[in-house]
Amino acid sequence: MTTVQPPGAATAPEPTTRPEALSLLGAAARHDPYAFYRTLRAEHPLLWDARLEAWLVSRYADVAPALAGSALAGPRRGPCCGPGTVRCAEEYTAPESAFALLREVCARTAHVLARRLAGRQEADLVEEFCRWLPTGTIAAATGLSYAAVMGRSGPAPARSRAEAPAATDLGRGRGGTGVALLAARCADQAVLTGRALASLMANLLANPEQLELIRAVPALIGQAWEESLRRNPPVHVVLRRATSDLAMSGGTVPAGAAVALLVGAANRDPDRFADPDRFDLHRTTAGALALGPVDCPAARVAELQAECAVHALLTAMPGLRAADAFDPAESGLLTRAPHRLLVRPS
C-alpha cells in the first residue's frame, strides 16, 4: 500500500498503517491531537492529507527549518511573526521605556481583574481573566475601546501591519503615545496571547508542585511561560505553500503544493525534547516553536503579560487551586487552548 498522493507529487513516504484514514480534519485528530501527532511522527512524517488537500509535516527536524527557511510562502498580511520565525519582520522599534510603561499598564489591569475574582468560591480563568487581560491592556494603553481592539485582534488578521492606528488616534491611552504605538502594534496577537495564558495557567494548576515553586520564586515565571508555549502552543498548525521542491523526512513536497506544518507535533517530538509530554519549567532544551523570536515586540509584550498575569493571580489569590470540576480540555484546530479553567480562588 502506498500513501495517497496528489496529482504531480514527487515522492511520498511508505506507511506502515492505512494513511488514507489519517486526516487533520478527522475524528482522531479532533479527539486527541497529541496521539495523532505521535502516529504521524513515528509512521508518516510526511503525509498527504486528501481531506485537507495539504502535506502534513510533523517532525521537529522538518518543521523548524521549514518555518525558518524561504522555500515556503505564507500570507502577505497578518502578524509580523509566528512560530519558528528567526528574525522579526516588524520595522517598528519600541524604546525600552515603552516596554516598561506597558508593563505598568498590564500589571494594573491584571490586578484589577484578579481582585474581582478573589472573593469568589469558583471562577473560570479563561472567560474571566485570560481572554480579558491582553485586550484590556491594549485598550488601556491605546485609549481604544475594548470592542475596537477585539476588531483588530485574531490569529490570522486580514490586514497589513501598515494599517496600525496613527499616533494621533492614540493620544488617550495611559503612558503616552510611545506606549500606545507599541500596544497597537501588538494588537494582532491579543487573542493568541489570551489562549497562551490559558494554557500556562492550565499547566501550572495541573502541576501544583511547580505552581508552589512559582509562588516561592516568581523569577521562574518566564521559564514556565516558555515551557508552556512548547508543550501547548497557541498555534498548532501553520499553513504554507511550497515555492520549490522541498525535501522532508520520508519524501519530497512538490513545488506549488500546500503544506501544513504541525507545530503542536514538532514541539513534542521526543527526538528534540526529552519526555516531551511532561510540563517541566526547568527544561533546558531550547528551540521550542512559540510566538516569535526574542527581537519581536509582540513576543516580548506577550511574555510580560504572562508575568503580570501570574503575579497578579497569585498575589490576589494566595490559595488559588484547581476546582473539583477542573478539566483543562483544549479545543481548536489551527489554534488550540483550554476553553474553560474552573478554579477556587481561595
Where are these regions (language model features)?
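Cytochrome P450
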Residues: 1-346
